[in-house]
Design a protein with these regions (language model features):
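Basic nucleic-acid-binding alpha-helical/helix-turn surface characteristic of O6-alkylguanine DNA
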Residues: 1-112, 160, 164-165
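Short Lys/Arg-enriched helix C-cap and helix-to-coil transition segments
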Residues: 130-137
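Active-site phosphate/pyrophosphate- and oxyanion-stabilizing loops and adjacent acidic/basic residues
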Residues: 38, 120, 155
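Helix-turn-helix DNA-binding helix
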Residues: 112, 116-119
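Terminal helix-turn-helix DNA-binding modules in bacterial transcription factors
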Residues: 122-127
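…primarily DNA-binding HTH/wHTH and HhH modules…
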Residues: 140-165
Length: 165
């Protein structure tokens, strides 16, 4: 079974889904339990139970990150992505705390300089935001660009990181 824990933050509700091997999904959305259950069945073929055996460390690290006490997350994760998306998200983990890169710069980081839109798609489908810090990816002109949990949350995370340096 997949464990689920949900908790409220200043930026909204955060949910963590995890199996024994690691965290599979982090969500800032107020997703219904039915929607999360469907995601789990489609991606892992399992249902959800509320629990803390597999989510405690991730929750602790995320709370410390969001309070400015931690600059990176290192709890175990289960990467449910295509090879290309894995390359994009792993490259983004190398972007230092408090810094940003453009979609084009990330495309160059993975050796695919023309794959700018594909980098955007990988970020849009990132099941583990914060762990894979897609909020650090901005448009080439310096504007924020999109973010699955809203531009306000993206700005909040970037401001948090710049204040905690």
């Amino acid at each position: 079974m997949i464990e689920s824990v949900c908790f409220k933050l200043l930026i909204g509700q955060l949910s963590i889904l995890a199996v024994k091997e690691g965290v599979v999904k982090i969500s800032f959305e107020n997703e219904s339990m039915e929607k999360m259950e469907k995601w789990c069945r489609n991606h892992l073929g399992m249902g959800i139970v509320e629990g803390t055996d597999f989510t405690t460390e991730a929750k602790s690290q995320i709370l410390n990150y969001l309070s400015g006490k931690r600059k990176s997350l290192n709890f175990p994760v289960v990467h449910l992505n295509t090879l290309f998306r894995k390359r994009v998200l792993e490259a983004e983990r190398n972007i230092p705390y408090g810094q940003t890169r453009s979609y084009g710069e990330v495309a160059k980081m993975i050796g695919r300089p023309k794959a700018i839109r594909a980098v955007g798609s990988a970020n849009a489908n990132n099941p583990l935001p914060l762990y894979f810090p897609c909020h650090r990816i901005i448009n080439a002109n310096g504007t924020l660009g999109g973010f699955g949990w809203g531009v306000d949350v993206k700005q909040y995370l970037l401001d948090l990181e710049s204040k905690s340096l």
